[in-house]
Design a protein with these regions (language model features):
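Polar, enzyme-active/binding microenvironments
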Residues: 56-58, 62, 72-75, 181
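Extracellular S/T/G-rich loop segment that most often corresponds to the catalytic His/Ser-adjacent loop
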Residues: 97-175
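Active-site neighborhood of phospho(di)ester-bond hydrolases with catalytic His/Asp-centered motifs
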Residues: 50-52, 82-89, 111-112
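Subtilisin-like serine protease catalytic core
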Residues: 1-29, 77-79, 105-107, 129-135, ...
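Solvent-exposed loop/turn segments at secondary-structure junctions
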Residues: 23-24, 55-58, 88-92, 115-118, ...
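Catalytic-core regions built around general acid/base machinery
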Residues: 66-79, 101
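Subtilisin-like peptidase catalytic core
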Residues: 1-63
Length: 191
């Protein structure tokens, strides 16, 4: 049975490998990117990667973060695509907050959340990268505005909301297009 029957997309089930990146004291984003680079290079059969990480800080105008740039490099070097949660946050003045790194990666698909009425939720962030690339690339159901996504936790089912819960649904669709339909990364991304 499906945890979220309203979101059944007919893509079937996929085997998923989880790679934990330890967030011990003293870690930094460069350590995380180094670990991602190593994990991706050691798992060349995986072409679609879901990343749920991000900075609370907003991106700077006319710049791309080092993290976003390095993820773009990893994608190019390994012929993979990253699906990245668009980061959550609300600015103190109630305005929509700009995305945080690494959601400014140009070649990744950045995912934000909408509710079940297709309305953007309050915590979704947005931003223009290098004055030209508008992020997020796509939005999907991630809970919010009173709607929730069901997930499994150690103590049972929990009701949650966030871009980190919307991104895996897009990763599924990309995996279907690349691994089942045999489309290239570029073709799948264009769809």
């Amino acid at each position: 049975a499906s945890l979220n029957p309203k979101l059944d997309d007919g893509c079937g089930r996929f085997r998923v490998r989880h790679f934990g990146i330890s967030l011990q004291s003293g870690f930094n984003s460069f350590t995380i990117i180094k670990q991602i680079r190593e994990i991706v290079s050691q798992n060349s059969d995986i072409k679609v990667w879901n990343l749920s990480l991000g900075s609370n800080d907003e991106i700077r105008e006319n710049f791309i973060s080092v993290e976003g740039s390095l993820l773009d490099e990893i994608q190019f070097d390994n012929d993979v695509i990253f699906i990245i949660a668009g980061t959550n946050g609300i600015a103190p003045d109630g305005q929509r907050k700009k995305i945080g790194a690494p959601a400014d990666s140009l070649n990744s698909i950045i995912v934000n959340s909408v509710d079940f009425s297709n309305q953007v939720v309050s915590y979704s962030r947005e931003g223009v990268v290098l004055s030209f690339f508008i992020k997020p690339d796509v939005s999907y159901y991630g809970g919010g505005n009173g709607d929730f996504i069901n997930v499994c936790e150690p103590l049972g089912i929990a009701r949650v909301a966030g871009t980190s819960f919307a991104a895996p649904f897009i990763a599924r669709k990309m995996a279907y297009l690349i691994h089942i339909m045999r489309l290239s990364r570029e073709e799948a991304k264009a769809l």
